[in-house]
């Protein structure tokens, strides 16, 4: 995967992390409870903004993934056993942060018989038990398309369930380890058919065309997806899939307009958008 012709990062992608008291307090709570966040492990460009507002996306089931997607910075390897205290720790941290809306994601745990589904469900239930006024959004793996495992998450009743398509159909096999485009669509269909709001996210700048992005939008609409996030792919290290192009803010605006015209209820589309960016706005809109 040579990357001799690196694309220069444009000015609109240069950000300042910045820190305020809320950022420092959020960081303290996360570290004191030995929690993992996708904010830090995924090197999210919005960490300063989100932590500064007292929000964070918690990553459960450890911080070592059994898959090795070519776009992702999360560590790959043999994960440790699940921590039975983690659901309680996450719920307690949400209470300490006084979050009105919590976002949870996880690594893939293909090493476990149930792929981590029971741990997922227990975490959601514990959050709701300790924080009855807090709404939850969960960004789940594909659970290898096993409907009975996805049902465990659905039955825990989060307000929004998200599963990321990540990229267009043509590029998906090149960058998604052990994942399948059509399996992901079926995961989203199952979520939507349950009555829970279905959400998905994609990256652009991997070499896709606008026509392919529109095709992906059509596929998502056809299975009942209501919320879509679109952000610029940023290559974590030289070993990862190279950036093919930096998409302009103007093109992101076009994608947003196109998505809304196609029938999505909400579209977040901008260079620094990530899956959980402005998630608190999505739940407020969803509850109207």
UniProtKB/Swiss-Prot annotation:
Protein name in UniProt: Lipoyl synthase
Single GO term (MF): 4 iron, 4 sulfur cluster binding
Annotated binding of [4Fe-4S] cluster 1, by residue: 39, 44, 50, 276
Protein family: Belongs to the radical SAM superfamily. Lipoyl synthase family.
UniProt keyword list: 4Fe-4S, Cytoplasm, Iron, Iron-sulfur, Metal-binding, S-adenosyl-L-methionine, Transferase
EC code(s) of this entry: 2.8.1.8
Domain Radical SAM core: 51-265
Pathway involvement of the protein, from the record: Protein modification; protein lipoylation via endogenous pathway; protein N(6)-(lipoyl)lysine from octanoyl-[acyl-carrier-protein]: step 2/2
InterPro entries reported for this sequence: Aldolase_TIM, Elp3/MiaA/NifB-like_rSAM, Lipoyl_synth, rSAM
Keyword Ribosomal protein attributed: no
GO cellular component: cytoplasm
Swiss-Prot/TrEMBL cofactor(s): [4Fe-4S] cluster
Location in the cell: Cytoplasm
Record-linked SMART domains: Elp3
Enzyme class: transferase
Catalytic reaction(s) noted: [[Fe-S] cluster scaffold protein carrying a second [4Fe-4S](2+) cluster] + N(6)-octanoyl-L-lysyl-[protein] + 2 oxidized [2Fe-2S]-[ferredoxin] + 2 S-adenosyl-L-methionine + 4 H(+) = [[Fe-S] cluster scaffold protein] + N(6)-[(R)-dihydrolipoyl]-L-lysyl-[protein] + 4 Fe(3+) + 2 hydrogen sulfide + 2 5'-deoxyadenosine + 2 L-methionine + 2 reduced [2Fe-2S]-[ferredoxin]
Pfam families reported for this sequence: Radical_SAM (PF04055)
Entry's cofactor comment: Binds 2 [4Fe-4S] clusters per subunit. One cluster is coordinated with 3 cysteines and an exchangeable S-adenosyl-L-methionine.
């Amino acid at each position: 995967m040579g990357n001799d012709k690196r694309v220069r990062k444009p000015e609109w992608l240069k950000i300042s992390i910045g820190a305020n008291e809320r950022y420092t307090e959020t960081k303290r709570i996360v570290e004191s409870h030995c929690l993992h966040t996708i904010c830090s492990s995924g090197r999210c460009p919005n960490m300063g903004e989100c932590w500064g507002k007292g929000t964070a996306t918690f990553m459960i089931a450890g911080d070592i993934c059994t898959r090795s997607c070519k776009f992702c910075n999360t560590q790959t390897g043999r994960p440790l056993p699940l921590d039975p205290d983690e659901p309680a720790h996450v719920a307690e941290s949400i209470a300490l942060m006084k979050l009105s809306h919590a976002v949870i994601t996880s690594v893939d745990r293909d090493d476990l018989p149930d792929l981590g589904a029971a741990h997922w469900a227990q975490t959601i239930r514990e959050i709701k038990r300790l924080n009855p006024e807090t709404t939850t959004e969960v960004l789940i793996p594909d659970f290898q398309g096993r409907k009975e495992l996805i049902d465990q998450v659905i039955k825990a009743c989060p307000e929004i369930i998200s599963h990321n398509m990540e990229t267009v159909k043509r590029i998906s096999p090149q960058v998604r380890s052990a994942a399948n485009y059509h399996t992901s669509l079926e995961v989203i269909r199952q979520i939507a058919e349950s009555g829970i709001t279905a959400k998905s996210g994609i990256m652009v700048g991997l070499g896709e065309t606008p026509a392919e992005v529109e095709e992906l939008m059509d596929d998502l609409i056809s299975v009942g997806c209501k919320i879509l996030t679109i952000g610029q792919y940023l290559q974590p290290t030289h070993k990862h899939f190279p950036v093919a192009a930096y998409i302009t803010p103007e093109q992101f605006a076009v994608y947003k307009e196109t998505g809304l015209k196609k029938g999505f209820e909400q579209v977040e589309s901008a260079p620094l958008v990530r899956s959980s960016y402005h998630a608190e706005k999505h739940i407020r809109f969803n509850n109207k």
